[in-house]
Amino acid sequence: MRNFVIIAHKALTTGDFSLNDLPGSAGRMDILCRCINSCLFLSHDLRRDVQVHLLLLGEPEPGKIIRFDSEHVRYLNPDERSAGSLIKKALQKTAGEYEVRSTPGVFIRSGNLGTLLNEFKDAGRRLIYLHEDGEDIRELSDLTNNAVFILGDHMGVTEEEEQLIKEHEAKTISLGPIPLHADHCIILINNEIDRNLSGKSQ
């Protein structure tokens, strides 16, 4: 199962926000909503082999992880408000060390980037960090669903986060020389994996 980690530095960590103001009072929650849709949606269906891990680092309780499991998620439509509603419901739950289900296929717990990286590393997953200075993704012939892709939000990734990612031996890859929005990167990544798995990669 392919995994995406999106680091959200300003995203509000309580459910006290309006679905009518996702970019503002919710701390650019609109970015996370677009990332969820890019990760999970096909033309007329949902992907069933994707997990999305939203790392929320905004106020007032930084350090929450919301996981979307595409195999079991329900009540998700292809619009920002729908995804925002599921995030809001998750944030209304008490987040502790262990996951709590808020709605089908959506879970929340407390944690940080190190928490996720350690878990993936211990599970033998391949960590891939997206950055325009990395190796061209099309040079990777073994891109499969085993990979975990790590992306920043509109603020990118801090030096401390990047150092932690490198300490966990993540491979840095690029989708091209020009920085792209995280949700656009996800669509391109999914396409590359789809092509590799179908044997049509060039």
Swiss-Prot record:
Superkingdom classification of source: Archaea
InterPro entries, A to Z: Alpha/beta_knot_MTases, TrmY, tRNA_m1G_MTases_N
Binding of S-adenosyl-L-methionine, residues: 130, 152, 185
EC number: 2.1.1.257
Gene3D superfamilies: 3.40.1280.10
Assigned GO CC terms: cytoplasm
Signal peptide: none
Keyword Methyltransferase: yes
Keywords (A to Z) from UniProt: Cytoplasm, Methyltransferase, S-adenosyl-L-methionine, Transferase, tRNA processing
GO process terms (BP): tRNA methylation
Subcellular location: Cytoplasm
Primary residence: cytoplasm
Function: Specifically catalyzes the N1-methylation of pseudouridine at position 54 (Psi54) in tRNAs.
Family, similarity comment: Belongs to the methyltransferase superfamily. TrmY family.
PANTHER family xrefs: TRNA (PSEUDOURIDINE(54)-N(1))-METHYLTRANSFERASE
Protein name listed in UniProt: tRNA (pseudouridine(54)-N(1))-methyltransferase
Native source organism of the sequence: Methanococcoides burtonii (strain DSM 6242 / NBRC 107633 / OCM 468 / ACE-M)
